[in-house]
């Protein structure tokens, strides 16, 4: 990357700015610039797109996205220690990198979105990644403001995102993701690619919006999945008792003796629409 974009190696940047990844912020810096390019390429063509990035840290992934020709990157970073390193990248790519200091969970990404295609590419902080994904999945209006999500998670979370019925990893997250998006796991990233190395393998997942997901009220689907998977080993007649139990299941045409992990996304939507 240094040869490609003319910027110093990331290890030098981190040392010069005294940056150490902080566990409280869910940080693990990705220093392998071949990997950051691979992540950016997973999002497809970037030339016409504005990219949202969360938690850029010292900017390894940011640099890859810009070097691959993204029209603009809007990066949200709450760690003020990283801002000088990101400012150097902004100077190197005039007018193409905007850094917003703040908490991504409190950021209205849709309000920040300019005209044209939007893609979200991020090595998400482990402690907020799942909540950010759910926020992006559950706007009332659909299709969403974004064209695709290319995100890094702990592998266990990635497996939950892409899981479908009769899979041990299947749960509320798999239903919400499968309802509104097409999902795939792109590739794994070993712990040694990060500083400091996490204790687990990470994985990159890619999600694209379904044009016409099954009509279903977001709040009702959340209620049903939360109740069903809250007691996932119990029969649905028992786990869904607070929502109507057997009466609800009969109305939806679903056998009350089944368990949550056997239901397809379509059947969960049937239940939500029967509330």
From Swiss-Prot:
Xref: PROSITE patterns: RRNA_A_DIMETH, SAM_RNA_A_N6_MT
Function as written in the Swiss-Prot or TrEMBL entry: Specifically dimethylates two adjacent adenosines (A1518 and A1519) in the loop of a conserved hairpin near the 3'-end of 16S rRNA in the 30S particle. May play a critical role in biogenesis of 30S subunits.
Name recorded for this polypeptide: Ribosomal RNA small subunit methyltransferase A
Record-linked NCBIfam families: ksgA
Catalytic activity: adenosine(1518)/adenosine(1519) in 16S rRNA + 4 S-adenosyl-L-methionine = N(6)-dimethyladenosine(1518)/N(6)-dimethyladenosine(1519) in 16S rRNA + 4 S-adenosyl-L-homocysteine + 4 H(+)
Assigned EC number: 2.1.1.182
GO terms under cellular component: cytosol
Protein family per UniProt: Belongs to the class I-like SAM-binding methyltransferase superfamily. rRNA adenine N(6)-methyltransferase family. RsmA subfamily.
Enzyme class, spelled out: transferase
Coiled coil: none
Keywords (A to Z) from UniProt: Cytoplasm, Methyltransferase, RNA-binding, rRNA processing, S-adenosyl-L-methionine, Transferase
Source organism, top-level taxon: Bacteria
Places the protein is found: Cytoplasm
Residues the record lists as binding S-adenosyl-L-methionine: 28, 30, 55, 77, 103, 123
InterPro entries for the chain: KsgA/Erm (IPR001737), rRNA_Ade_diMease-like_C (IPR023165), rRNA_Ade_Mease_Trfase_CS (IPR020596), rRNA_Ade_methylase_Trfase_N (IPR020598), rRNA_adenine_dimethylase (IPR011530), SAM-dependent_MTases_sf (IPR029063)
Major subcellular site: cytoplasm
Example GO molecular function: RNA binding
